[in-house]
Amino acid sequence: MWRFKKDRSLESSIAYMCGALVITAGVGACLLRGLFFTEEMYPFLTLWFVLCCTCSLYYLVGVGAWRKSGGGAVSGITGVNGVSEGSEGSEVSGENKALRILLSVPLIILSLYVIHWLRGPLSSQGTMNEMLRWGLYASFALLVCFCAVNRVGRRIVNVTWSMAGMFLSMSALLAVCGVVKLPFAVAYSNSSEVSATGVRLAGLMEYPNAFGAVMAVFLLERLFAVAVYYGEPKKSVNMLGARSVGLGMECAEAERRSKGAGGVEAEQGKAGSTTAALLRLLPLFPYTAALLLSESRGAWLTAACACAAVLLWKRQLIAPLLAAGAAPVAAAALLYRQLARAGLAVEPVPGLLLLAGLWAGALLAGLWLCRRQRSAAGTARAAMLALAAAGWTAAGIAVLLHVRERITGPSSTVSARGLFYRDAWRLAAEAPWLGRGGETWRHAYLAAQSRPYVGSQVHNGYLDILLNLGFVGLAAILLMLLATGWLLATKSPRLLPPFMVIVLHSVVDFDWSYGLFWLLLFWLPALALAEDKQKHQSAPTHPQSETKLPIQSTSTNPLTNVSTQANPLIAQSTSTNPLTNVTTPTNPLIAYPTPKKSPQIRLRQLIGTTVCCFSLLLGVLSFHAAQGEKFYRQAIMSVDPSVKVELLQQSLGWNPRSPRTVIALSRLLSGEQSVSLLRQSLLYSPENASLSWELAERWMSSDHPGAALYWIDQSFRLDKYNNAKWVKAIEGMLLMGQKKLAEGNRKEGLVCVASGNELLLEYRRLAEEEANKGGQHNDREFQMTEQADDLSRRLSMLALRF
């Protein structure tokens, strides 16, 4: 008994640490704008990897201490082994394989980026950023899945999911009401193709499309959770409460407290049941309102497709889903019409009153509809469903009439993305198997673009992976998505709609540039594991039958590939019970110490040590990047040139891979020092258009026209639709020619003038070609400028004189 308690204490401590890390990731994703800007993530990543290293050290030291003291196996809640009663060995094996793929692919992606980083990528800085990101994703996936199969961690996973969704939605809605100050929570546009009202809700993510997709994920998770709950028979309260994760954990507790035997207990039970039901419906209205106010057509469409696909499979959920969503959707549509008419800018008091009134109405009406749908029969139930369908229809008409022009009219954004995709495919063909490293499109789109558009994001997550890691990386991602979908379909089909939103919406937007989407993607299977575990723990057991029929099956640990004994009927300890003679299952996400140091144990120790060392390495790397970013920001704010130089040099000392730091410092140094610094930076970013142009400018200010022309050509090869560069290059060659002629060097002077004329002719040719294609997609306004015409006259006059 003493050993058992100590083992449970060790596992609980690890579960609390992992849960704290899951909370940290959720908070960081919400506060750091969805983890989009890597530069502002560096301090968070440093803290994250230090905590991961500490957690792994604690685990290794704790398990080692118990092994030396002869302690028993660390008991824990069974995970993917033996969670289903009467499950066949093939099902368990398939589940383990899916979980193993889910946890292994992020490590494979991380390894591919490490390989690129070592062999010289297109951008060393971009590849380092992706390494840090995937280190975060891989560790988060492992931690959240471990928490999901532990009783303590399971509650943390569920509650943190719900709190993250509520925080994102409520912060955006309160910003609209003027209660919370978020500078970029509302996006403005004068184009009717971008917004029907000129304003769209972007929330903490500061991008309406991504924000809408996130809200669709949270909305469908909760909507289908409520539909599953009210779609089952009224009995089995405990099991149904367990199936509703997130706020459903509190609902299950409230319903367990609601069991009473008349009198005061019966009244308290009724109140507890109502409270649980209200908690279950609570997030639907803010999620729906935020989704509608984002005015994201892609999020709306993917949410509708995901719902339709799952409802075709689970048709018994249609009626409860109609009842659960009718009131929140209708109230959210009314709020959308009111706030859109006001330009998403209302006074705090009227806005809060409107928000609170509609929310309360949606809660009460939704509760009534759900209960009537569950208890009524015959004509009454048909009337109730007709009323719910009318609510959905009215809400849809109200919203669609408001945005019909955006939906039915031509869309420049759709054609622009088609242009992005064509250019991206051509770029991907240059390195089809392994890609060109991290952030390839961001650093190469200027060279790859066939029109002068502005788009540092390719607006397709799969193409982005293809550009970075080639078909090898894309195949790994697709395999992980298939494994995740299979795991959700077998463990919790109601989680398929939010998963499908992530998978589908990333086809048309750059969702995967936000770290939050990857966290949600790994969070969903953890929720499925947690729900499945809670469901089977809540199921009734029969001790006598367990004693007579000690069912045992051999299963495989998905992380260590160690065979363990699994009993699907008992989930208490891995030790043998002397009274029942039944061997109980093991936790697949924790290594179990044994007195003998077997090869498997040594392998697990090696893996744990590797994880610890790799976390430490990534932590050091992110700390260096954070220090470099800190000194760079200080240098930008400084007005003293000498202080600027000192701070920029310190920044480069911490992170020599940053091109913008090199460019800023090179402009403050002398000619030779500047050229040397820029050449050195090209080793980290060999095809950086800005670095090539800086070198061209340095050589144009010297007496080396040949070197100047070389770097001008390099710069235009990497960025040809740049008016300012063409004008400066032509002017630079003109000034060099004038200087050479004034010095009496007629030959070199005429060569410079002729080179300027050639540049001018090429510039005019490109500008005429672009003008013939029309103004659409000419976001950079590439055209012949008045300054270029003036330079043409000056070159002609100089050529006539000599």
Regions flagged by a language model, labelled:
Residues 397-416, 605-642:
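Hydrophobic alpha-helical transmembrane segments in integral membrane proteins
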Residues 2-15, 235-239, 274, 330-336, ...:
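A juxtamembrane structural motif centered on a specific transmembrane helix
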Residues 2-33, 47-59, 110-117, 129-143, ...:
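Alpha-helical transmembrane segments of multi-pass inner-membrane proteins
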